[in-house]
């Protein structure tokens, strides 16, 4: 088996680690999938424990950061880094440990961008914050910032790398389909940041 394939499989399994689910159980919240949106990501954890949501966000970002770091250690081609990030994000969205029902991939995307290009990551985070302050929708902020990151990647990176990132962005936006429908119906919940 090609060693790069081994790396991608490893990235998938690392990406599959459901930190939101694990932390919720360990801290006594219970199965986070049975509350709110049913998602295991930081936004849904936020509805139960705001400080725990921050830890979930950091760990979900860290796992993809680690995946990309592993890929770089064994291959200097930046394209491999984009693929490693993609597989980590797929793992997060469709975790083998939770019967392939996971998060939406936003935190892992941020983590991988921090490693690949911190400038794009900074733009991603900046636009997320600005959008969120304006609308209070985490879902819309995630979609907008993902598209902004895609614009930067398409501008400064190769066609192949841009295509890989476009696939990643499409997956993330697709994971937000229910949120998009709720926003169109004006039934999407806004996030209250008060601690």
From Swiss-Prot:
Known pathway: Lipid metabolism; phospholipid metabolism
GO cellular component, one term: plasma membrane
Keywords (A to Z) from UniProt: Cell inner membrane, Cell membrane, Lipid biosynthesis, Lipid metabolism, Membrane, Phospholipid biosynthesis, Phospholipid metabolism, Transferase, Transmembrane, Transmembrane helix
Coiled coil: none
Signal sequence bounds: none
Entry GO MF terms: acyl-phosphate glycerol-3-phosphate acyltransferase activity
Complexes and interactors: Probably interacts with PlsX.
Role according to the record: Catalyzes the transfer of an acyl group from acyl-phosphate (acyl-PO(4)) to glycerol-3-phosphate (G3P) to form lysophosphatidic acid (LPA). This enzyme utilizes acyl-phosphate as fatty acyl donor, but not acyl-CoA or acyl-ACP.
Name used for this protein in its record: Glycerol-3-phosphate acyltransferase
